[in-house]
Structure formats: structure tokens, C-alpha cells
Swiss-Prot record:
GO terms for molecular function: mRNA binding; structural constituent of ribosome. Belongs to the bacterial ribosomal protein bL12 family. GO terms for cellular component: cytosolic large ribosomal subunit. This is Large ribosomal subunit protein bL12. The keyword Ribonucleoprotein applies. The lineage of its organism: Bacteria, Pseudomonadati, Pseudomonadota, Alphaproteobacteria, Hyphomicrobiales.
Length: 126
């Protein structure tokens, strides 16, 4: 155990360039790649992240995917939902796909989605 502590202490004194050189030397010596080690380490993290969405989502983002044929109606509805001015609402609609409202409850997101779809827009909830 004392040897490991000494190694850790010695490694802690290396500069970034020396550490990079050490990594290259170890890759050559052991016939491995640091990139492969990173990919292996990232695997379990992705699995843990996939388990997280099993919980109920509480905040939603309403995204305007497309404005469809009724652009003016969609602009009016975006103004009503967001409180934006005419130019800002028009710019948002024309830049679709674009978030209209972020961090809203599920009920509010569904209400906004229904209103925008009624105006002719294609809407996604994220």
C-alpha cells in the first residue's frame, strides 16, 4: 500500500505535458488506447442516465416545430402565449423549430400545445 501512495504522490507532481507524455508511453507499453478507456467508462454513465427518465417529468418545453399554412394565426397565438411583440413573435415563428415556452408544467404545456395546434402549428413537448 505504501508503494501505491508513493506512486500517487509522484504522479501528483507531474505537469500536464509530462502527464500526457506518460499516458502515451503507457499506451505504447500496454498496447491500449486512452480513447477506448474513456468509451468504456462512459458506458455505465449512459445506462444511469437512461434510468433517470423513468421518473415523472415535471417541467416541459413547448417547441414550435413548424408553422404550417396559417402563419399569421400561429404568430397571433405565439404572441398571446408568450407576451412577445409582433416582430419578436414573427421572428420566433419563422425560425422554427424553436422553443416557445420553457420550464412549464405539464398542464400548461398541453394547453399551449393545443392552442398552437388549433392555430395550425406543429408542436412538440420536451
Amino acid at each position: 500500500m505504501a508503494n501505491l501512495e508513493k506512486i500517487v504522490e509522484d504522479l501528483s507532481t507531474l505537469t500536464v505535458l509530462e502527464a500526457a507524455e506518460l499516458a502515451k508511453l503507457l499506451e505504447e507499453k500496454w498496447g491500449v488506447s486512452a480513447a477506448a478507456a474513456v468509451a468504456v467508462a462512459a458506458g455505465p454513465a449512459a445506462g444511469a442516465a437512461a434510468a433517470a427518465p423513468a421518473e415523472e417529468q415535471t417541467e416541459f418545453t413547448v417547441v414550435l416545430a413548424a408553422f404550417g399554412d396559417k402563419k399569421i394565426e400561429v404568430i397571433k397565438e405565439v404572441r398571446a402565449v408568450t407576451g412577445l411583440g409582433l416582430k419578436e413573435a414573427k421572428d420566433l415563428v419563422e425560425a422554427a423549430p424553436k422553443p416557445v415556452k420553457e420550464g412549464v408544467t405539464k398542464e400548461e404545456a398541453e394547453k399551449i400545445k393545443a392552442a398552437l395546434e388549433k392555430a395550425g402549428a406543429k408542436v412538440e413537448l420536451k
